[in-house]
Amino acid sequence: MPNTSFLQRFLQVQLTLNKGEFADGKNSKIIDNLAISAKIEKLGPPDFGKASVEIYGMPLADMEQLTTLNFRPLFVSRNYINIFAGDDVNGMNQVFAGTIVSASADFNSQPETKFKIEAQIGFWGSVTAQAPTSIKGTQSVADFVAQQAKKAGMNFINEGVTASLRYCVFNGSPIQQARTAAFQVGAELITDDDDMILLPANKPRSGDVPLLSKDTGLLGYPSITQNGIEFKAIFNPAFKFAGLVELKSIVPKTSGQWRIVKLVHNLTSNMPNNGAWESQITGFYPHLSGAIGRFI
């Protein structure tokens, strides 16, 4: 992806109500003409990906429909948010999908009110209570995880795990049971947006490997930290959590392919005083960052 620092960028937020409807009589609304800022974090086990969104100038009736009472943390509506980012040249790409866990209006930011949303990937699949699951005999771990993904309301993708489970019992929510099963066979389970992805140990997600250099969106210079190689870049939808990125830099020992173990997008649109459109990436050795828990 070429350096696109001077393109006009767009954020699009789709809000879907589990119950009720907006003023237009529909249960889903797309917002793309208001000032929006979004911080999206893609994280690995035991955490979940999350997003913090602020929308300015939202109609009062819409805010009323979406507002939750934050002091009742277990009373969460099954409202859903999808976030898309892009530009006129490269089109729009989904960068987040998850359950709204809190939403409220801030009227102290006058002259523009802002509506603040916190969302989490796989929320209901992580808190839904269910009975223990007993496997009598042998079952492929892919089939077992697929069943748990369905219970969690997520899509299932198997990227090459062929191991089996034998005579075992799993407890907890659908996602907890799926994670435990993957760990038991030495595989890795990723929850990303609508997908539950099963990976062989220490293998990156499939797909193209974006090349990142000063000519293709690298911002500043990479840093070597205890957590891995950390660097910033102009947002690129090809960056995928648990996927690879190829880095080219003059900083010694930072060039090469790294597995993305933490991915944070800071994105804004229609905000004259804030043009943030960047990603913060932490990369680690591809062969050491998988099921052994090298997510940070």
Which residues does each PLM region occupy?
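Extracytoplasmic/secreted envelope proteins and their assembly/folding machinery
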Residues: 97, 142-146, 175-179, 239-243, ...
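Second-shell loop/turn segments in exported
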Residues: 129-137, 163-168
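An acidic/polar, Gly/Ser/Thr-rich interaction patch typically located in mid-to-C-terminal regions
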Residues: 45-70, 201-296
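Short beta-strand-centered interaction patches in the first periplasmic/extracellular domains
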Residues: 2, 107-124, 151-222
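Glycine-rich, acidic and aromatic/proline-enriched surface loops and short helix-turn segments
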Residues: 140-155
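Assembly/oligomerization scaffold segments
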Residues: 1-115, 269-271
